[in-house]
Amino acid sequence: AWDPLPTGDGQKLSLRVQSNGRAYRSYSFSFTEPWLGGKKRNSLTFGINSSKYSNAFDPFTGQIDRDRSDTNYLKTTGFSVSLGKQLKWPDDFFSLVYTLNVTNYKLLNYPIFDQNFRTGTSNNVSFKIGLQRSSVFNPIFPTSGSNIMASVQLTPPYSLFNKNISSSDNKYKNPEYHKWRFNAEWFVPIGKAMGADKSRQLVLKMAAKYGFMGRYNKKLDYSPFERFQVGDAGLTNNFGLLGYDIVAHRGYPVYQSSDPTV
């Protein structure tokens, strides 16, 4: 029988377009091959993306200003390549992922971190290694198992080769940092599963998260990109454009906490 839709071997193709007019637009494309090389579970993912966030709102008129959208904006263009490998040791639940990411930021009258960095370009080039062990049953609605992940993300130490980078006009042209993350989640079923298919299960989730961001040169400030954001639910802000990792803190505004030392 003729089948016009090939099933393939689990490849994933994604195309996403978002826009709300002059203020924001985003395009992204990615492709994942989960069986690179044929028999082994080695995944290869390639992705490209482009976005523009304009400060087009005029507070005096309460309207979107076309001219402001062309003179106050943040543009990002990037691509990434990721290679994942399932490990056999210590057990089959372990996987190792390597990711190369390149993102170009272009700012025009758009302060994001430093008031002196309102206009210019920045090239964020980083390499990330992530080790994960996941034994979660039913990933969409987990009922048991655990998910533990540790990763480190590094940029080249540009200041090691250019001693004058700290005194240059654009200190963030090539941002440098090293970023560490550790996440752990446990899902513990409570009581007996109910329902005809035993899918109704009360589950206790326990989690711990740790993040650290460092710099190679103390004369340079921390990178305005790839930071950690503490507070808020992480759903309604534009920090995703800057590569921020969101540490949700429900009930508190962005960057605020009951303990000012957090």
Where are the language model's segments positioned?
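C-terminal outer-membrane beta-barrel translocator/porin domains of Gram-negative envelope proteins
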Residues: 1, 113-262
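Gram-negative/organellar outer-membrane beta-barrel architecture
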Residues: 1-141, 146-148, 247, 255-260
